[in-house]
A protein has these predicted regions:
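Conserved small/polar residues in nucleotide/adenosyl-binding loops
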Residues: 199-206
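Post-transcriptional modification and biogenesis factors for structured RNAs
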Residues: 209
């Protein structure tokens, strides 16, 4: 699957966070998403697929989130029986950060049908400010929903939490709860998809229900 191919790296260059996300799209093409985030939340997304490069200006990116991702000592976990429960036990506490809502309209859906996960992830990075691995994972779900239901629009409601170690309140990971609502042209709800993503986990370990 697309999510299993995701590789993400971070570095800090003069207070600018550089995030590089690489993955293989559903059409077999290799994709690179190169995002920069400055302290004021502005930045740029440069995405390359099939030797074609596009650029988008970014605003309202959470510098704090990306700084923690770039400096966190949390290592990606291997999949096991405790994935999911390992960050919901009493040794961790979830701290609410924000709610966001983003609408994928009919024009964007048509672009996703052509561009695949690369287009979906780029839209989510711009609209919901998701970290690369989470954007690719949720983007994969979005592409699946679009191809399966051919919706007129998709509304994504997102809740963001920080997860801290309970014993010393130190940062562990970010937790993204995303719900995708698909509607037909008459405004009728067609499908609901939920995902829970932890930034310390590899994208393919995102939890679905």
């Amino acid at each position: 699957t697309v999510a299993r191919t995701v590789q993400v790296s971070y570095k800090i260059d003069k207070n600018t966070i550089i995030e590089v996300t690489r993955f293989t799209d559903i059409d077999g093409q290799n994709v690179t998403l190169n995002r920069s985030v400055k302290e004021d939340g502005t930045g740029e997304l440069v995405y390359t697929k099939a030797q074609k490069t596009k650029k988008s200006k970014l605003t309202n990116q959470s510098y704090d989130v990306f700084l923690k991702l770039a400096t966190s000592k949390s290592m990606p976990q291997t999949r096991g029986a405790t994935v999911g429960s390992d960050v919901t036990g009493s040794q961790y506490k979830h701290i609410f950060v924000s709610n966001l809502s983003y609408t994928i309209d009919n024009t964007a859906i048509a672009q996703i049908e052509i561009g695949g996960v690369e287009t979906a992830a780029s839209l989510l990075i711009t609209g919901l400010h998701l970290p690369g691995s989470t954007a690719v994972t949720v983007g994969s779900f979005l592409v699946s929903v679009v191809l399966a239901t051919s919706p007129s629009k998709v509304v994504i409601n997102q809740s963001l939490y920080e997860v801290h170690f309970a014993y010393d309140n130190s940062y562990y990971t970010h937790c993204y709860h995303d719900i995708l609502y698909s509607y037909d042209s008459g405004g009728h709800l067609m499908d609901t998809t939920k995902s829970v993503s932890y930034t310390h986990l590899r994208a393919h370990e995102t939890l679905m229900n």
